[in-house]
From Swiss-Prot:
GO terms for cellular component: cytoplasm. GO terms for molecular function: ATP binding; phosphoribosylaminoimidazolesuccinocarboxamide synthase activity. Its EC number is 6.3.2.6. NCBIfam families: PRK13961.1, purC. Keywords: ATP-binding, Ligase, Nucleotide-binding, Purine biosynthesis. InterPro entries: SAICAR_synt/ADE2_N (IPR028923), SAICAR_synth (IPR001636), SAICAR_synthetase_CS (IPR018236). One of its GO terms (biological process) is 'de novo' IMP biosynthetic process. It comes from Desulforapulum autotrophicum (strain ATCC 43914 / DSM 3382 / VKM B-1955 / HRM2) (Desulfobacterium autotrophicum). This is Phosphoribosylaminoimidazole-succinocarboxamide synthase. Belongs to the SAICAR synthetase family. The keyword ATP-binding applies. It catalyses: 5-amino-1-(5-phospho-D-ribosyl)imidazole-4-carboxylate + L-aspartate + ATP = (2S)-2-[5-amino-1-(5-phospho-beta-D-ribosyl)imidazole-4-carboxamido]succinate + ADP + phosphate + 2 H(+). Pathway: Purine metabolism; IMP biosynthesis via de novo pathway; 5-amino-1-(5-phospho-D-ribosyl)imidazole-4-carboxamide from 5-amino-1-(5-phospho-D-ribosyl)imidazole-4-carboxylate: step 1/2.
Length: 295
């Protein structure tokens, strides 16, 4: 197994942001978004990563950016290192396959979450009071049930180490104005529906996902990552059975191990065992092949 890329060190380049998974460099005209193999769970970056994960996320996002282009513009300029500025070329080996040259968008301060099925924190909330993010749901749903229609449940965008906080639609109006809030909601549901339909044909249920949007020349565009195993719950369609937790192609495998380990969900996180890493690598590779046809 290859070694995980946990850090990028390009001393003659301008690092402007280090996120949970991505390192962002300013090249002057554009940003260079390098997707590392770091793994975050429960809003904590874990000490060891998943080898090759950054390449999987980049390929899947590139696939979806192209699929969604008729619905919404995006920030992707190129994933080909040959197109990157000269200052990047000495680092071509590290950058190759895990990097996007992207437009300089101004991120909007909302995580746009769409839920097509009830699972995870949404299921816990429904068990407690019959609601999901303040939205009352029909009685009688079971864990992993498909919702009558996809729900838009936005949250704040937390800094590294902080937790995202669910907010209602009215709060997004306060944050970004009614017109943009409505646009983000409508686009999120449209993108989810198109992506979920595409994935279903390939044997994958996208149970829920999150999108991020930004502004370029005052136009709302899709940024960051799109419907990857890091930002979504992916379930195999052939084993789907409502009434309990589902097998998954995403980092739920790691989340389940973390819960069983007795970790208190506070930083620092525990070291992930090699068998859990190997299993996660296999799941990410499988979903890449199913969705994009690439290896």
């Amino acid at each position: 197994m290859d070694k995980a890329v946990l850090e990028t060190q390009f001393p003659d380049m301008n690092l402007v942001r280090k996120g949970k998974v991505r390192d962002i460099y300013d090249t002057g005209e554009a940003f260079l978004m390098v997707t590392t193999d770091r793994l975050s769970a429960f809003d904590v970056v874990l000490p060891n990563g998943i080898p090759g994960k950054g390449k999987v996320l980049t390929k899947i996002s590139e696939f979806w950016f192209k699929q969604m282009a008729p619905l919404v513009g995006n920030h992707l300029i190129s994933t080909d290192v040959a197109d990157f500025p000269d200052v990047c070329q000495p680092y071509a080996k590290v950058l190759s396959g895990r990097t996007m040259l992207v437009k300089k968008a101004e991120p909007l301060p909302v995580e746009c979450i769409v839920r097509g099925y009830i699972s995870g924190s949404g299921w816990k909330s429904y068990q407690n009071n019959g609601t999901l993010c303040g939205i009352t749901l029909p009685k009688g749903l079971v864990e992993s049930d498909r919702l009558p229609e996809p729900l838009y449940t936005p949250s704040t965008k937390a800094e590294v180490g902080d937790h995202d906080i669910n907010i209602d639609f009215a709060k997004t109006v306060d944050l970004i104005g009614r017109e943009r809030a409505e646009k983000l909601r409508d686009l999120s549901i449209q993108i989810y529906l198109k992506g979920a339909q595409t994935a279903l044909k390939k044997g994958i249920i996208i149970a829920d996902t999150k999108f991020e949007f930004g502004l370029v020349d005052d136009e709302v565009i899709l940024i960051d990552e799109v419907m990857t195993p890091d930002s979504s719950r992916f379930w195999p369609m052939d084993t789907y059975a409502p009434g309990g937790a589902q097998k998954s192609y995403d980092k739920q495998f790691v989340r389940d191990w973390l819960v069983s380990s007795g970790w208190d969900m506070k930083a620092p996180g525990p070291e992930i065992p090699q068998d859990v890493i190997a299993g996660t690598v296999a799941k990410y590779q499988e979903v890449l092949e199913l969705i994009t046809g690439q290896k």
